[in-house]
A protein has these predicted regions:
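Glycine-/small-residue-enriched capping loops at alpha/beta junctions
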Residues: 1-103
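Phosphate/ribose-phosphate-bearing ligand recognition and processing surfaces
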Residues: 80-208
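A short, Lys/Arg-rich alpha-helix, primarily the initiator
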Residues: 221-259, 336-352
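The alpha-helix within a helix-turn-helix
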Residues: 252, 263, 293
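Recognition helix of helix-turn-helix/homeodomain-like DNA-binding domains
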Residues: 267-284, 308-311
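Short, basic-rich loop-to-helix N-cap that marks the start of a DNA-contacting helix
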Residues: 280-294
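Short amphipathic recognition helices of helix-turn-helix/homeodomain-type DNA-binding modules
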Residues: 302-351
């Protein structure tokens, strides 16, 4: 754990291992495979693959990464698409799983996959994406491994049209409306100032203060403030609300959940959760708080309270916040589905 989608060139991803979509003879292919060979060094990588010689579809083998910013290349042999009637789904899931097992064997902490079989192999992108997410998610729920799924474009995402349209409408009704209101207020304010400046410039015979609108006129001094009761810093500290760590652990206990279940459902690593657990005054990032809200299946009101305990609040000007609020309202608590929507809108994902 965790699992994140990124938009990048896989040959530039800094991970312990990157995965090459390979053929059974481990020969250089086109597209992503060619890019990996060129970045690693064609002669060295070709020689290493020739020494292995062969690999069956649904399996993966390992070579050094040579010139890549990684330690290893896992060559996962991908199935070509033949209509889905020849065991392609099982082979594709096997290719992912075999590469993930190699990551464990070689003590990798991170591995980066392209979307296997979706290019020249002809696998429908939405189906290929679903198999990738399902297989990776199942694996990282049981292993401490950071997995990146490297995508070039949004066309790879398996977001249903109905859900996407619903999110679009929700954003239009809330995020856009809020920003339009701010824009209208700012525009009215600018128009008012411009009219006042024009009036002042048009009549130079009067002193500036006579041209000023009433809002700038002299005002009587404010009444003296009532003396505030003295409060020591110690008093203030004693009256602090529940800390983020305390509230988080209480919510887990109240639901009768295991810590491991919650941090995995929240796309948080075991090490990260341990840091939170051991520090009552831990100061999390906002995306971490929101990730736990999804992992704990909180309501919007409960999420507001959890955010407040960490010093945050939902922002009307944040598209990410509106997407998360939509998911909470609709009870979409699958962290990968939430992150897929965030990725679709170029927003920071939740979790690690």
């Amino acid at each position: 754990m965790p699992f994140l989608m990124i938009r990048n060139d896989i040959t530039k991803v800094a991970a312990d291992a990157i995965v090459n979509p390979a053929n059974r003879n481990l020969l250089q292919g086109s597209g992503t495979s060619r890019a990996i060979y060129q970045a690693a060094g064609e002669q060295e990588l070709t020689a290493a693959c020739e020494a292995i010689g062969h690999c069956e579809p649904g399996r993966a083998v390992c070579t050094p990464a040579f010139g890549l910013p990684a330690k290893y290349i896992f060559h996962a042999v991908c199935p070509a698409w033949h209509g889905g009637f020849f065991g392609e789904a099982k082979q594709l899931a096997g290719a992912y799983h075999s590469a993930l097992e190699l990551a464990a064997e070689y003590h990798c902490e991170s591995v980066a996959f392209p979307l296997l079989s979706s290019g020249n192999y002809g696998y429908p992108k939405e189906q290929a994406f679903r198999i990738a997410v399902d297989t990776i998610t199942q694996y990282v729920m049981e292993h401490d491994l950071t997995v990146y799924l490297v995508l070039y474009d949004r066309g790879s995402l398996a977001v249903s049209r109905k859900l996407f349209t619903s999110v679009e409408e929700y954003i239009d009704d809330h995020y856009v409306a809020q920003n339009d209101e701010s824009y209208q207020f700012g525009r009215r304010r600018r128009e008012y100032v411009e009219r006042w400046e024009d009036a002042a410039l048009a009549d130079r015979e009067y002193p500036a203060q006579e041209c000023a609108p009433p809002v700038f006129a002299a005002a009587p001094p404010p009444p003296a403030a009532a003396p505030m009761a003295a409060r020591s810093l110690e008093n203030l500290m004693d009256n602090l609300g529940e800390s983020f760590t305390t509230r988080l652990l209480r919510l887990i206990d109240e639901r009768g959940l295991k810590d491991s279940t919650v941090y995995k459902q929240s796309n948080i690593s075991r090490q990260h959760f341990s840091k939170i657990q051991c520090n009552r005054d831990y100061n999390p990032k906002k995306k971490t708080v929101l990730a736990f809200a999804v992992g704990l299946h909180l309501s919007e009101d409960e999420t507001i309270d959890l955010l407040k305990s960490a010093g945050y609040a939902f922002s009307d000007g944040s598209k990410r916040d509106w997407i998360v609020r939509y998911c909470l309202e609709q009870k979409i608590y699958n962290i990968n589905q939430v992150n897929t929507l965030l990725f679709e809108y170029d927003q920071e994902q939740l979790g690690a």
